[in-house]
């Protein structure tokens, strides 16, 4: 994993997909509290990340893209679209891809609250994201990418006895960025 600190020197314009719920909501809240400008992209606001060209046009003027929302393979398709738009930019850009530790599991393990089929589909979508992340991150570019793989995080949609509250997990991620 490439190490860098992006918050030490300037305020940023940050695009976050899925900013109304869960981890995305916490990133939006905590980064806004630090003074950053948030460009929130979510279905509840009428946006659809499956419209990748349109969504990428909202993200393009930003400094950091937190690629959080999942909608079939649109999360991966959006990563490619944004990366290609940013690859020849004169300034630094950052992409944080939100994946999951579920990718480490064997295929016969079911995610709490999902059917076995839904668990497999979710895992496969995140594996596709991680594969694309690895491929693009190996390219020479001013785009700095980070793969974030949370474990069980307590959100409106998910809770288990071992889950960490979303606010706590996001705070830890942001503190790591401040001290790298």
List each model region and its residues:
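N-terminal amphipathic/basic-hydrophobic helices that include classical n-h-c signal peptides
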Residues: 1-11
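Structural signature of the Rossmann-like NAD(P)-dependent dehydrogenase/reductase core
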Residues: 17, 66-68, 94-100, 144-149
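N-terminal Rossmann NAD(P)H-binding glycine-rich loop of SDR-like oxidoreductase domains
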Residues: 17-30
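Adenosine-cofactor binding site in Rossmann-like domains, unifying the SAM/SAH pocket
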Residues: 38-56, 71-73, 77
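Catalytic loop of short-chain dehydrogenase/reductase
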Residues: 70, 74, 87-139, 152-155
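Short-chain dehydrogenase/reductase
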Residues: 79-83, 129-133, 170
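C-terminal helical subdomain
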Residues: 142-143, 147-148, 153-180
């Amino acid at each position: 994993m490439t190490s860098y600190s992006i918050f030490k020197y300037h305020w940023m314009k940050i695009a976050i997909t899925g900013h109304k719920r869960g981890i995305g909501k916490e990133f939006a809240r905590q980064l806004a509290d630090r003074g950053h400008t948030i460009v929130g992209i979510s279905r509840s606001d009428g946006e659809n990340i499956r419209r990748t060209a349109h969504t990428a046009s909202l993200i393009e003027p930003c400094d950091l893209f937190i690629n959080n929302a999942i909608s079939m393979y649109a999360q991966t398709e959006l990563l490619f679209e944004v990366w290609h738009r940013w690859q020849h930019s004169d300034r630094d850009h950052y992409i944080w891809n939100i994946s999951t530790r579920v990718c480490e599991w064997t295929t016969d393990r079911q995610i709490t609250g999902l059917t076995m089929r839904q668990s497999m589909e979710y895992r496969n979508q995140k594996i596709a994201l991680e594969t694309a992340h690895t491929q693009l991150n190996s390219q020479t570019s001013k785009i700095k990418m980070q793969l974030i793989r949370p474990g069980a995080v307590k959100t409106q949609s998910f809770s288990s006895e071992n889950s960490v509250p979303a606010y706590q997990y996001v705070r830890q991620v942001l503190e790591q960025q401040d001290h790298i």
